[in-house]
Amino acid sequence: LWWLPESGLLAAMLALLAAACLLLPRGAPGRLLGLLLWLPLLWPQRELPSGPGALDMQVFDVGQGQAVLLRTAGHALLYDAGPRSRSGFDAGERIVLPALHALGVRQLDMLMLSHGDADHAGGMAALVASLPIGQVRGPAGMGQPLHGHCQADDHWQWDGVVFTVLHPPRHFPYLGNDASCVLRVDTAHGSVLLAGDISALVEQRLLRAGSEALAARVVLAAHHGSSSSSSGAFVQATGA
């Protein structure tokens, strides 16, 4: 199959006009020129971030789980892969992968799994089987095969956007939710904080390490908004 990015309204209207042209009687002048009006469907606008420091963030609706796409001008990172349930429903295959196709994402530079629970890492296998992925990273000790681990103070820069891992520190034991990779993304227009499923205990540790690193314009609530996370002090420190 040849996957095409989702087209805009203008391209769809031009395609309908092209179909109307082709339905004209044979011999009608310019009838076959209607084929040219289908070209915008083949090369749709991808609406990528433009310029240094720009970021596009898409939070996919995967139900009880998480999958977040972060795109700079030339790179793409997926934070978590969506859930896979015991019934066999795989959000990585049914939701995340079609959404990536619709957005024109043909490969991922990185898949970062916050931790190994099925609602965050369950869709990994479907994505790895279907997309070229530069590297898969997650906390040390999780069961899934990884190319490398996320550790505090890891940082890199793509197209003027800076990515920094705040948690877990080196040699931190794998504790499931509380071992989640906490990722901070600094752009030219503000910061994003992705906290996985950490609890208030880890939030307190991050506060002791320095609340200035938590200040962000956008925060995705930890552990799906659980009452065991998003403590008052943490929320106040983010100022989101």
Residue ranges and their predicted role:
Residues 1-58, 71:
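Transmembrane helix-bundle segments that form internal channels/tunnels in multi-pass membrane proteins
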Residues 49-54, 159-170:
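Short Pro/Gly-enriched beta-strand edge/turn motifs at strand-loop
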Residues 76-80, 109-113, 135-138, 193-195, ...:
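Structural recognition of the beta-strand scaffold that forms the well-ordered cores
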Residues 105, 133, 237-240:
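Proline-aspartate-enriched helix->loop->beta-strand connector
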Residues 116-153:
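Active-site HxH/HxHxD metal-binding segment of metal-dependent hydrolases
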